């Protein structure tokens, strides 16, 4: 998990020479390719990965069927293949990899119910399905698979705790990092940060993947100062796989703080990045930086690059393109949004309370104002105020294409659920699902469906 992939390759060469009949290096070779693509997203690496993955599966298929490692190794390779193929928009092929992974891991569970390594992959499959992009969700849906985020995360959490000791303890780091990343990506809970920090305490400080996951989770949960500290202190050296996305995360953290050097991190990412994700979003955030210092030329120029450069594959890049076409929000709203994202809630509230809502003429701006006040008050544990503004956002934006009303309904439902008012919670989860927002719909709807499942 340190992402010292060159050293890993050398160890696998040594293992093959010393134990030529051992098939586990086939799985570990796939890990190396998997992490290379997660950090780099290069098309040439992807083409090689698909070819090599199939060769590895062919070799594993003639192994010892009486061993739990027979199904496990094939299931893990299929699962890694599914995640990478989904990243490259190869949805139908990814769907078949998911089907094969599910078969191998479930079959193994039936034959070897005490084989703990299976549970990470099984939990991951169950949790992730609902958060798949629409194209992949459609493809997998034809294969008859269903999701349950809560059930999947619970299985991963139970597995991680059991991996803290015993003969499979070497899998703890992987389990803790995957769980922290997945939980933060598909559930919206302030507890995700503390959970991540606690899980990762025992992981080697020289793990580049650890730095990435903690930085990512810190950003997702409003801890930009922590993200900056962790990413600045990350291990460096030629032994590590190139990971340009770490500079992208640093840029977001610095922009949330409205630091004057935020753009330098995005430019570094754009220079070193060879992948397909976050190019549009980087140019949008460079435009934000210019906008905040009233550099009209740089602002307009980078908005044009949002439209002309990169790909609209990831949700962040799709949203960046929408915003570039619509125009950036009024400056106080943008400052409030960035401050909120960074965890600077009092500062965010000050920006918003200085705004007269009547001065906001566009529907999107008014909805964001109401919604953002709800989010800030919820973060400040002022629940009644949060619910008031969530209701206003929901009522004003119920037929809007923007995500504010739907996410407001989702948060109202979660508040009612926490208060054990399940009748109101169900109503707002259903209202959330009925809305026709065009932004972040898959992720919002998945959380609403999962909320309804919890109350059955």
Locations of the language-model features?
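Residue-level detector of the short coil/turn that links helix A to helix B
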Residues: 3, 89, 147, 187-188, ...
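Short coil/linker segments at helix-helix boundaries
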Residues: 3-11, 29-181, 185-195, 199
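Alpha-helical repeat scaffolds
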Residues: 10-14, 46-61, 92-106, 144-160, ...
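Solenoid-like repeat scaffolds
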Residues: 13-21, 64-65, 111, 141-146, ...
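TPR/TPR-like alpha-solenoid signature
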Residues: 27, 34, 72, 79, ...
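Residue-level recognition of tetratricopeptide repeat
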Residues: 31, 38, 76, 83, ...
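Generic helix N-cap/helix-start motif at coil->alpha-helix transitions
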Residues: 67, 115-116, 134, 168-177, ...
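C-terminal soluble interaction/assembly domains
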Residues: 363-456
């Amino acid at each position: 998990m340190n992402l010292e992939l060159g050293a890993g390759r050398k160890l696998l060469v040594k293992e093959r020479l010393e134990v030529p009949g051992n098939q586990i290096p086939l799985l570990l070779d796939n890990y190396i390719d998997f992490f290379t693509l997660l950090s780099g997203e290069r098309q040439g690496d992807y083409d090689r990965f698909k070819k090599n993955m199939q060769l590895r599966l062919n070799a594993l298929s003639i192994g010892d069927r009486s061993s739990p490692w027979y199904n496990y190794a094939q299931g893990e390779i299929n699962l890694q293949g599914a995640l990478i193929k989904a990243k490259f928009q190869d949805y139908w092929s990814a769907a078949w990899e998911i089907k094969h992974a599910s078969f191998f891991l479930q079959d193994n569970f039936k034959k070897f119910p005490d084989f703990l390594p299976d549970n990470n992959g099984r939990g991951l499959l169950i949790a992730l399905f609902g958060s798949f992009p629409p194209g992949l969700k459609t493809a997998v849906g034809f294969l008859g698979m269903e999701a349950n985020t809560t059930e999947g995360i619970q299985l991963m959490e139970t597995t991680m705790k059991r991996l803290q000791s015993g003969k499979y303890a070497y899998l703890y780091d992987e389990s803790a990092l995957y769980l922290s990343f997945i939980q933060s990506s598909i559930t919206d809970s302030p507890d995700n940060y503390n959970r991540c920090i606690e899980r990762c305490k025992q992981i080697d400080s020289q793990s580049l993947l650890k730095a990435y996951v903690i930085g990512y989770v810190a950003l997702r949960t409003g801890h930009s100062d922590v993200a900056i500290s962790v990413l600045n202190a990350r291990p460096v050296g030629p032994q590590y796989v190139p990971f340009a996305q770490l500079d992208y995360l640093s840029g977001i953290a610095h922009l949330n703080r409205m630091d004057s050097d935020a753009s330098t991190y995005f430019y570094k990412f754009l220079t070193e990045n060879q992948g397909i994700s976050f190019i549009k979003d980087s140019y949008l955030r460079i435009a934000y930086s210019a906008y905040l210092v009233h550099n009209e030329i740089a602002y307009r120029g980078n908005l044009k690059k949002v439209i002309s450069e990169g790909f609209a594959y990831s949700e962040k890049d799709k949203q960046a393109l929408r915003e570039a076409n619509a125009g950036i929000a009024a400056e106080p709203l943008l400052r409030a949004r960035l401050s909120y994202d960074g965890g600077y809630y009092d500062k965010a509230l000050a920006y918003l309370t200085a705004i007269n809502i009547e001065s906001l003429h566009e529907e999107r701006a008014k909805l964001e104002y109401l919604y953002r006040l709800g989010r800030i008050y919820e973060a400040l544990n002022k629940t009644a105020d949060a619910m008031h503004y969530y209701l206003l956002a929901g009522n004003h934006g119920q037929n809007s294409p923007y995500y504010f009303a739907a996410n407001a309904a989702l948060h109202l439902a979660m508040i009612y659920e926490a208060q054990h008012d399940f009748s109101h919670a169900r109503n707002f989860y259903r209202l959330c699902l009925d809305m026709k927002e065009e932004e972040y719909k898959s992720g919002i709807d998945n959380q609403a469906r999962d909320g309804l499942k919890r109350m059955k």
